[in-house]
Protein backbone atom coordinates (compact mmCIF):
# COMPACT_ATOMS: atom_id res chain seq x y z
CA UNK A 1 0.00 0.00 0.00
CA UNK A 2 1.54 3.29 -1.13
CA UNK A 3 -1.34 5.64 -1.78
CA UNK A 4 -0.14 8.39 0.56
CA UNK A 5 3.18 8.96 2.34
CA UNK A 6 3.81 11.72 4.84
CA UNK A 7 7.16 13.35 5.53
CA UNK A 8 7.49 15.28 8.80
CA UNK A 9 10.08 18.06 8.75
CA UNK A 10 10.30 21.19 6.62
CA UNK A 11 14.07 21.68 7.01
CA UNK A 12 16.96 20.55 4.84
CA UNK A 13 16.65 16.83 5.63
CA UNK A 14 12.91 16.86 4.96
CA UNK A 15 13.41 18.72 1.69
CA UNK A 16 16.15 16.41 0.41
CA UNK A 17 14.21 13.31 1.47
CA UNK A 18 11.06 14.61 -0.24
CA UNK A 19 12.88 15.36 -3.51
CA UNK A 20 14.31 11.87 -3.66
CA UNK A 21 11.05 10.26 -2.60
CA UNK A 22 9.17 12.11 -5.38
CA UNK A 23 11.57 10.75 -8.01
CA UNK A 24 11.56 7.23 -6.60
CA UNK A 25 7.75 7.06 -6.21
CA UNK A 26 6.18 9.56 -8.62
CA UNK A 27 2.69 8.04 -8.40
CA UNK A 28 2.45 8.13 -4.60
CA UNK A 29 0.66 11.06 -2.97
CA UNK A 30 3.36 13.00 -1.09
CA UNK A 31 2.28 15.05 1.92
CA UNK A 32 4.72 17.27 3.83
CA UNK A 33 4.10 18.27 7.46
CA UNK A 34 6.00 21.16 9.02
CA UNK A 35 5.94 24.18 11.29
CA UNK A 36 6.96 27.01 8.96
CA UNK A 37 4.72 28.17 6.09
CA UNK A 38 7.62 29.79 4.22
CA UNK A 39 9.64 26.58 4.29
CA UNK A 40 6.62 24.49 3.32
CA UNK A 41 6.07 26.71 0.26
CA UNK A 42 9.40 25.49 -1.15
CA UNK A 43 8.02 21.93 -1.45
CA UNK A 44 6.46 22.75 -4.83
CA UNK A 45 6.70 19.14 -6.02
CA UNK A 46 4.62 17.74 -3.11
CA UNK A 47 0.91 17.02 -3.50
CA UNK A 48 0.02 18.66 -0.18
CA UNK A 49 1.69 20.56 2.64
CA UNK A 50 0.25 21.08 6.12
CA UNK A 51 1.24 22.90 9.26
CA UNK A 52 1.37 20.27 12.01
CA UNK A 53 -1.31 22.09 14.01
CA UNK A 54 -3.68 22.42 11.00
CA UNK A 55 -4.12 18.87 9.73
CA UNK A 56 -7.47 18.24 8.03
CA UNK A 57 -9.93 15.96 9.81
CA UNK A 58 -9.84 12.42 8.44
CA UNK A 59 -6.42 12.68 6.77
CA UNK A 60 -4.57 9.35 6.84
CA UNK A 61 -1.27 8.12 5.45
CA UNK A 62 0.05 4.68 4.58
CA UNK A 63 3.67 5.29 5.59
CA UNK A 64 5.62 8.08 7.31
CA UNK A 65 9.15 9.45 7.27
CA UNK A 66 10.44 11.43 10.27
CA UNK A 67 12.97 14.15 9.38
CA UNK A 68 12.43 16.39 12.41
CA UNK A 69 15.05 15.38 14.95
CA UNK A 70 15.75 17.19 18.20
CA UNK A 71 13.14 17.97 20.83
CA UNK A 72 10.25 17.98 18.35
CA UNK A 73 10.77 14.33 17.37
CA UNK A 74 8.38 13.03 20.01
CA UNK A 75 5.47 15.18 18.84
CA UNK A 76 6.17 14.29 15.21
CA UNK A 77 6.30 10.55 15.92
CA UNK A 78 3.11 10.75 18.00
CA UNK A 79 1.36 12.52 15.12
CA UNK A 80 2.60 9.91 12.64
CA UNK A 81 1.29 7.09 14.81
CA UNK A 82 -2.09 8.85 15.02
CA UNK A 83 -2.41 9.38 11.24
CA UNK A 84 -0.86 6.18 9.87
CA UNK A 85 -2.96 3.26 8.67
CA UNK A 86 -2.53 -0.16 10.34
CA UNK A 87 0.57 -2.11 9.25
CA UNK A 88 2.29 1.03 8.00
CA UNK A 89 5.99 1.80 8.29
CA UNK A 90 7.63 4.75 10.02
CA UNK A 91 11.20 5.56 8.96
CA UNK A 92 13.16 7.53 11.55
CA UNK A 93 15.81 9.74 9.93
CA UNK A 94 16.00 12.80 12.21
CA UNK A 95 18.63 12.79 14.94
CA UNK A 96 17.65 13.59 18.51
CA UNK A 97 20.20 14.25 21.22
CA UNK A 98 17.88 12.73 23.82
CA UNK A 99 15.85 9.55 24.20
CA UNK A 100 12.44 9.96 22.55
CA UNK A 101 9.40 8.28 24.16
CA UNK A 102 7.26 6.33 21.69
CA UNK A 103 3.66 5.23 22.21
CA UNK A 104 4.36 1.50 21.93
CA UNK A 105 0.75 0.63 22.80
CA UNK A 106 -0.46 2.18 19.53
CA UNK A 107 2.53 0.84 17.59
CA UNK A 108 1.52 -2.67 18.68
CA UNK A 109 -2.21 -2.08 18.23
CA UNK A 110 -1.73 -0.87 14.66
CA UNK A 111 1.00 -3.40 13.84
CA UNK A 112 3.40 -0.68 12.77
CA UNK A 113 7.00 -1.12 11.65
CA UNK A 114 9.60 1.40 12.85
CA UNK A 115 13.14 1.58 11.53
CA UNK A 116 16.04 3.98 11.46
CA UNK A 117 18.26 4.49 8.47
CA UNK A 118 21.61 6.08 7.73
CA UNK A 119 23.26 3.17 5.94
CA UNK A 120 25.87 3.40 3.22
CA UNK A 121 23.59 1.60 0.75
CA UNK A 122 21.14 4.50 1.03
CA UNK A 123 23.83 6.92 -0.12
CA UNK A 124 24.84 4.65 -3.00
CA UNK A 125 21.21 4.74 -4.18
CA UNK A 126 21.39 8.54 -4.00
CA UNK A 127 24.27 8.63 -6.47
CA UNK A 128 22.34 6.35 -8.84
CA UNK A 129 19.34 8.69 -8.68
CA UNK A 130 21.54 11.72 -9.51
CA UNK A 131 22.74 9.88 -12.58
CA UNK A 132 19.26 8.81 -13.65
CA UNK A 133 17.56 12.15 -12.91
CA UNK A 134 20.09 15.00 -13.22
CA UNK A 135 17.29 17.55 -12.71
CA UNK A 136 17.33 16.61 -9.00
CA UNK A 137 20.35 18.89 -8.65
CA UNK A 138 18.15 21.83 -9.63
CA UNK A 139 15.83 21.14 -6.70
CA UNK A 140 18.75 20.64 -4.33
CA UNK A 141 20.28 23.96 -5.34
CA UNK A 142 17.27 25.54 -3.59
CA UNK A 143 18.79 24.64 -0.22
CA UNK A 144 22.19 26.23 -0.86
CA UNK A 145 21.97 29.34 1.27
CA UNK A 146 25.46 30.72 0.66
CA UNK A 147 28.80 29.93 -0.94
CA UNK A 148 31.86 31.26 0.87
CA UNK A 149 35.42 31.20 -0.45
CA UNK A 150 37.75 30.02 2.29
CA UNK A 151 41.45 30.85 2.48
CA UNK A 152 41.87 31.26 6.23
CA UNK A 153 40.45 30.33 9.61
CA UNK A 154 38.72 33.73 9.68
CA UNK A 155 36.92 32.80 6.44
CA UNK A 156 35.83 29.50 7.98
CA UNK A 157 34.52 31.31 11.05
CA UNK A 158 32.55 33.66 8.80
CA UNK A 159 31.03 30.70 6.92
CA UNK A 160 29.99 28.93 10.13
CA UNK A 161 28.48 32.14 11.54
CA UNK A 162 26.48 32.65 8.35
CA UNK A 163 25.25 29.07 8.52
CA UNK A 164 24.15 29.32 12.16
CA UNK A 165 22.12 32.47 11.50
CA UNK A 166 20.10 31.07 8.56
CA UNK A 167 16.65 29.52 8.90
CA UNK A 168 17.08 27.22 5.90
CA UNK A 169 19.79 26.17 3.54
CA UNK A 170 23.35 24.98 3.69
CA UNK A 171 26.52 27.01 3.44
CA UNK A 172 29.09 25.67 1.00
CA UNK A 173 32.74 26.40 1.64
CA UNK A 174 34.89 26.67 -1.48
CA UNK A 175 38.46 25.94 -0.41
CA UNK A 176 41.23 28.02 -1.98
CA UNK A 177 44.72 26.57 -1.93
Please give the residue ranges for each predicted region.
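N-terminal Rossmann-like NAD(P) cofactor-binding module of classical short-chain dehydrogenase/reductase
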Residues: 65, 91
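A short acidic, Gly/Pro-enriched loop at the edge of an enzyme's catalytic core
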Residues: 55-64
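Helix-to-beta-strand junctions that scaffold the AdoMet/dcAdoMet cofactor pocket
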Residues: 83-86
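Mid-domain Rossmann-like dinucleotide-binding core that forms the NAD(H)/NADP(H) cofactor-binding site
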Residues: 1-54
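Glycine-centered, small-residue-biased loops immediately flanking beta-strands
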Residues: 28, 88-89, 112
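C-terminal hydrophobic helical "lid"/dimerization subdomain
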Residues: 78, 121-177
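Rossmann-fold NAD(P)-binding glycine/threonine-rich loop
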Residues: 93-112, 125-129
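Short glycine-/small-residue-rich Rossmann-like dinucleotide-binding loops
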Residues: 68-72, 95
Amino acid sequence: RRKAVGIWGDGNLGYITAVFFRYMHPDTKLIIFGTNEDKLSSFTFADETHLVWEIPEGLTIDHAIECVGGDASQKAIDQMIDLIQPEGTIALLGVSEYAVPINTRMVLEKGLHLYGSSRRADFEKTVELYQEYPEILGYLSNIVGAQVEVSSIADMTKAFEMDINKMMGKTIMIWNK
